[in-house]
Each structure stands twice: as structure tokens, then as C-alpha cells.
Amino acid sequence: MIELENIRGQVADIFDSDSWIKFVHEGLLPAYTSGEKAKNVVLAAISNHCSICRNINGCCFPKNNMPEYPLHPNCHCFLVDIAKPQMKAECQEEKFTKYIFSSKYETNGKKKLFSDWGYDKIDSRYLTEEFIGQAEEKYCEGEFELGLLNEYGQRISIIIELDCKDEKGKVKFLTGWMVYPNGNIKLTTPYGGTVK
């Protein structure tokens, strides 16, 4: 009988830890692109639906790591319990080829950091895939920190860990992502500072 109670407790823990919600704003379509998010900001000015609610519509979060609800007084959003969604992280290779490793932005110090870790522009595809894999896994497990929530949506920070190519060990650093509907996130900041 004790074994059965332990199993029940473990099953309850599994369901509780996988407990996700979706923000829903009645009568509005979710914004799947940054262009649609920007359009929602404009539409909010001519409607009675705020841009924050418009741009979090359809976004999914684990119950133990979600934005404060209600989002504001008189919020029309409601929460729907959902199964853990299929996660998808998007990271454009240009975040590395045209930003991190670009001589145009060399003064921000990010190119030097990645170079010190043994990475160069030729590694952009690898870095893109690594960021996607780690971000999907960590978002799925709720291993992220909520950031700014404003008229453009909810930002989150995810820690990425890379092996240094010159065998100095590993490096961990913050990356910035924007949350989109149905378990989608998109990289906005490929390097936001180191962590211990």
C-alpha cells in the first residue's frame, strides 16, 4: 500500500510540475510576428483592448513561472489550463553573422568575448543550433526568468552554456527572448551578460 501511495504522489508531482497556462484575450487573434505585435500597439490606441493584452494573447507559461495575473485593472484576459505545448525556439543566424561577429558592432565587446571563447563567424550555424536546442529545453522546463512585459509582449532571459573551444571549460551567459503564442520564443539578445 505504501508503494501505491508513493506512485500516486510521484504522478501528482509530474502533473503539477507540467502545469501550463495560456493567456487568452477573447475575440482577438494572437500575434505571431514582431510586425503583428507592432500592429497591435497601433490597434490598441483605437480600441478598448490594450496592447499588452493583445501581445500576450496565446502565449504559454508554466504556472510556477508566469506573468502576474491579472495583467492590469479591468484586464479582459483569462487563463486556460493546457498541456505542455510543443516548444519552438527561433534564432536567426544573422544574430551572429551580422551582429556578434560583425566589425560594425565591434566596440560593444561581444565579438571579443566570443573570440576569447574560441568562436568566430564560421561558427555561426553551430551557435544558432546550440541556442535553439538549449532555449527550447529550458523554456519547456520553465528554466527562465521573466523580464519586461510591455506593449510589445513578454521578454524572458534564458541561460546558455557553451564549451570554450580552447578547453578553458564552459561559459554561462544570459540571452534575451520574446515570447510568442503556442510555445514559440524568438531570440532578441544573443548576449546579455555572464552569470556565475
Language model: regions and residue ranges:
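Domain-core detector
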Residues: M1-N74, V80-R125, E129-I132, E136
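Ribonuclease/tRNase effector modules and their secretory precursors
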Residues: A83-K196
